[in-house]
Amino acid sequence: MTQTSAPGKIPVTVLTGYLGAGKTTLLNRILTEEHGKRYAVIVNEFGEVGIDNDLVVGADEEVFEMNNGCVCCTVRGDLIRVLSGLMKRKGGFDAIIVETTGLADPGPVAQTFFVDEDVKARTQLDSVTAVVDAKHILLRLSDSREAVEQIAFADQIVLNKTDLVSEDDLRHVEARIKRINPLAPIHRAQRSNVPLSAILGKHSFDLERITELEPDFLNPAHGEDGHVHDEHCGHDHHHHDHDHVHDEHCGHDHGHHAHGHDHKSDIHDDGVKGISLTLDKPVDGQKITAWLNDLLARRGTDILRAKGIIDVKGENKRLVFQAVHMILEGDFQREWTDKDKRYSRMVFIGRDLDEAELRAGFEATAA
C-alpha cells in the first residue's frame, strides 16, 4: 500500500451520469455562474455543453475561457495530455471537473490520477459524483449496466429532477440507490441546483479524511436501506444524524467472527451490489495486506470500489485503505481512543461478488 497526501495539489472531481440526467445543466452552471472560483471543466465533446460565443473570452485549439474565469476544454482521447496542458496555464485553478459521458465505468478516469506520475504529482482525485434522473432511473437500472455502475462507483450522488416524482417514489428510488451503493450520500436537486460545495472539495480519496468524514461509513442511519444489523445488533433501532461521528456500531457482542451483509436489489442489479464485512478480532497486518493484494489481482476488474478501517494487532492507529479496481492504497491514520469500539470493517462494491468467499478471506486474516 502507498500513502496519500495532497498539499498544494489541484482537486479533481469526476462527473458521471446517464444521458439526460442533468450533467450538462450542472456543467453550464459551473461555467457561467459568478461563484468566485476558477474551475476547469473537461468534457468529451462540446456538443451538449452550450458554449455560447458571447460567453467566451478567448479560445485556443480546444480550450475556451469563460467570462467568469472558468475554462472549458474537450478531450478526444488523451486525458493526460489535456491535464498537462491545463497545468501550464497561468493562474491555476481551484478545481478540475472531468465529465465522463460515454464511459460505462468511471474507473479508468479515476485510475489516471493514481498511476500517471506527472498527473499524480500535481492533482488529487477529490471525488466521483453521479447525477441521477429521479424520474427515469429505475427504468435505466433495469436495462442499463452503465447506469448501475455509475451509481456503484460514486462518492456523491445528485438525485436530480426530484420535482417530477412523488415523495414516496423518491424514497423508493433512494432505497434502490442505497442497495447498489451504501456509501454515497444522496443530494436531492431540481434542475441540478445542488450547491457546488456538496460535490466539490469532498476529499473522498484522502485517507486522512476517511475516518474524519465517515467513521461510521458501513452503518447508514437505522431504518434506512443499507444499515448493517442483525439479531446481534447491540443498540436500539432509531435514526441518527447523517453527520454523526461517534461510534454507533453494531456488533458489540458479535464474538470473534466476521459478519457480511450484502445490499441486494429487488429489481435488477446486473450483479452489482455492496457487501459490508466486520471482524471483531484484531487482524495480522501482513495477512490483511496479502489478502487484499491477492483479491484485487484476481477480482480487481469486478471490484469497482472498496474502503476499510482495520484494527491491526500491535498498532495503536487504525489502518485505512481504499481501492479503485486493482489499485490499492492505505496508511495508518488516527489513534484508537478509549471511546472507540475497536473492530475492523470494510465494504466492497462490485459485480458478481461472492460474500461467503470475501467473509472467509477476511476472517482468515485474524491475528
Region locations from a protein language model:
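C-terminal accessory "lid"/substrate-recognition subdomains
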Residues: T2-T4, E149, V165-T337, K341, ...
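A secondary-structure boundary/capping signal
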Residues: L15, I42, D133, N160-K161, ...
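Phosphate/Mg2+-binding loops and adjacent switch elements
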Residues: R89-A198, L207, E212-E214
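Flexible loop/N-cap segments at domain edges
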Residues: F348
